[in-house]
């Protein structure tokens, strides 16, 4: 196993090599520096990955907010269209009621309302086109969001791989922790052995010091005895000097025999005393020589003992320093072990949070997939319904065109018939005036007026023909009214279909907004968990505070901001009106009134 724990800390074996086996410190420092560089690089890579993930999350949040705004605008527009449809429906119902009440007099209003309905239909078509465009844009945004979700899933996979790597590192760290504890126990045992050895050596040295002190005391006693013997030797030397002077006096006074004899006897006595004294002095000198030799040996032993004592002091000081260094190293190792424990706890908590977040993200992604499939199915259904509605609208438009053509042809026929009737009426009026004048002339002459059978039959046939034409005109008017009713019914059907489509689109948009809000809530939870993990890591002093990257750094390219479409407003003064139909309406309806009034006049004249 390597000699490195978390954060590049040197293991216990390295410390043993450092102090027990006399390993060099430069190698250990270089290995620690390399480990620190490696850990710094790994932290930089992890910070960059976190910054990239945070930037991607910020982008996704911004885009989700934009999509929400677009959905809100679309819902507002659909609500406005629904309100317009409701108001138009109420107006149509009011017009229908008025047409039922007014009868023929409400045709003009009905035609105007039909024009207004056509204008509203054109507006609704434009709104449908605009909504379809916005829907396409929203689908594109949904596709982009899906691509971003795939990118986020890739990031999740990379995070899972990092979590697996972290788990492996966690296992390695635990193994290193176990080995470090074993090494700590071994170091403590070695320290106890060293302490015992040092205590034994100190006890032995104390015993030696005591023996040396005793020998020093003995040497002091010997010195005192030597001093006393030296004093005795000096006394004896003075006595010898006196004896020598006495011998000189004896040699000078040889004249006196008695005195000589006495002195000789005394001299003999003194010589015997001197011999004894010289013998004693020689013995004392021998003792002094032996004592001096012993003193010299004692001095040498004292010097050796002093040297050993100084060496023992130095060794004890060195051992104290080593013990202090060992204590400092053990304290450092304990602090590093505590830091490693805290880091392991933080990593385990982070792994639990990341696993929880990964589970939440997987569940949310599965829900989004299911929602996406449901949305796709609903989109297919809505597209089919939109196709059916478009087909119905085209059919109704073709029916409108055919009915308009039929109405125009019938109106042309009515105009021709009116023109022919007007010519016939003019001829009849001229004929009537002429006959009236002739008959007045004849009545002045005679009281009776004679009419030929041909005239009678002609007049009766004309009356029948006029009745038939009047009936045809009434039938045409009734058909026209029925066509108007059918057109109003078709318009009502279209409005109901548009309401259904708008209601479905509103439901879809509400579902999409709910999904977006749910995804936003999930992403906010993820961001809160990441920020909590970030704060814990910053409190532990493991990770520096990364700068927020929210502008330029992007994962999958730059995303242009989606501009919210402005709602279109149509002014009532610029409404497009079909010119030919309005002109004919303005011209033909009064002609119909005139025609029916003339019909009534003719019927009154015939009566």
Curated annotation (Swiss-Prot):
GO terms for biological process: chloroplast accumulation movement; chloroplast avoidance movement; response to blue light. Disruption phenotype: Deficient chloroplast response. Residues 66-295, 329-445 form a coiled coil. Pfam families: WEMBL. It is found in: Cytoplasm. This is Protein PLASTID MOVEMENT IMPAIRED 2. GO terms for cellular component: cytosol. Its main location: cytoplasm. Belongs to the WEB family. Ubiquitous but preferentially in chloroplast-containing tissues. Required for the chloroplast avoidance response under high intensity blue light. This avoidance response consists in the relocation of chloroplasts on the anticlinal side of exposed cells. Acts in association with WEB1 to maintain the velocity of chloroplast photorelocation movement via cp-actin filaments regulation. Keywords: Coiled coil, Cytoplasm. InterPro entries: Web. Interacts with WEB1. The lineage of its organism: Eukaryota, Viridiplantae, Streptophyta, Embryophyta, Tracheophyta. The gene is PMI2.
């Amino acid at each position: 196993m390597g000699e490195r724990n978390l954060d590049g800390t040197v293991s216990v074996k390295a410390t043993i090599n450092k102090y027990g086996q006399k390993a060099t410190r430069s190698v250990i420092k270089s290995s620690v520096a390399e480990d620190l560089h490696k850990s710094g690089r790994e932290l930089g890579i992890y910070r960059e990955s976190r910054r990239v993930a945070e930037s991607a999350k910020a982008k996704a949040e911004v885009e989700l907010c934009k999509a929400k705004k677009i959905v809100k605008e679309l819902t507002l527009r659909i609500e406005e269209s629904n309100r317009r449809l409701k108001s138009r429906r109420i107006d149509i119902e009011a017009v229908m009621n008025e047409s039922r009440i007014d009868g023929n007099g409400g045709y003009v209003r009905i035609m105007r309302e039909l024009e207004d309905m056509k204008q509203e239909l054109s507006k609704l078509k434009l709104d449908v086109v605009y909504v379809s465009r916005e829907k396409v844009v929203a689908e594109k945004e949904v596709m982009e969001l899906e691509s971003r979700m795939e990118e986020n899933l890739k990031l999740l996979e990379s995070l899972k791989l990092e979590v697996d790597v972290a788990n492996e590192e966690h296992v390695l760290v635990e193994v290193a922790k176990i080995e470090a504890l074993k090494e700590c126990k071994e170091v403590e045992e070695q320290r106890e052995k060293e302490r015992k050895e040092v205590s034994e050596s100190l006890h032995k040295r104390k015993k030696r010091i005591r023996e040396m002190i005793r020998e020093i005391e003995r040497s002091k006693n010997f010195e005192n005895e030597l001093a006393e013997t030296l004093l005795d030797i000096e006394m004896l030397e003075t006595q010898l000097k006196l004896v020598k002077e006495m011998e000189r006096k004896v040699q000078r006074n040889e004249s006196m025999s008695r005195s000589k004899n006495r002195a000789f006897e005394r001299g003999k006595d003194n010589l015997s005393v001197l011999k004894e004294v010289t013998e004693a002095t020689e013995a004392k000198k021998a003792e002094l020589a032996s004592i001096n030799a012993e003193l010299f040996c004692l001095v040498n032993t004292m010097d050796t003992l002093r040297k050993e004592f100084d060496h023992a002091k130095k060794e004890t000081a060195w051992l104290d320093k080593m013990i202090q260094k060992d204590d400092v190293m053990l304290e450092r190792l304990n602090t590093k072990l505590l830091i490693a424990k805290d880091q392991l706890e933080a990593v385990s908590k982070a792994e639990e949070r990341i696993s929880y977040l990964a589970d939440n993200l997987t569940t949310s992604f599965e829900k989004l997939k299911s929602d996406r499939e449901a949305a796709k199915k609903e989109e297919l259904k809505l597209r089919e319904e939109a196709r059916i509605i478009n087909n119905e609208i085209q059919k109704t438009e073709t029916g409108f065109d055919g009915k308009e053509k039929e109405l125009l042809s019938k109106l042309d026929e009515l105009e021709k018939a009116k023109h022919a009737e007007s010519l016939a009426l003019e001829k009849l009026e001229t004929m009537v005036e002429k006959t009236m004048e002739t008959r007045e002339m004849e009545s002045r002459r005679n009281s009776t007026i004679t009419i030929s059978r041909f005239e009678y039959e002609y007049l009766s046939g004309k009356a029948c023909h006029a009745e038939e034409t009047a009936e045809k005109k009434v039938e045409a008017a009734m058909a026209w009214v029925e066509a108007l009713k059918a057109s109003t019914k078709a318009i009502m059907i279209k409005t109901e279909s548009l309401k259904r489509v708008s209601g479905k689109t509103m439901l879809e948009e509400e579902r999409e907004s709910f999904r977006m809000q749910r995804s936003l809530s999930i992403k906010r939870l993820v961001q809160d968990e990441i920020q909590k993990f970030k704060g814990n890591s910053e409190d532990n002093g493991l990770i520096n505070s990364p700068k927020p990257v929210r502008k330029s750094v992007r994962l999958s390219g730059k995303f242009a901001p989606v501009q919210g479409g402005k709602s279109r407003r149509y002014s009532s003064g610029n409404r497009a009106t079909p010119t030919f139909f309005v002109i004919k309406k303005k011209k033909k309806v009064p002609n119909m009134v005139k025609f029916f009034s003339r019909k009534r006049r003719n019927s009154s004249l015939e009566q």
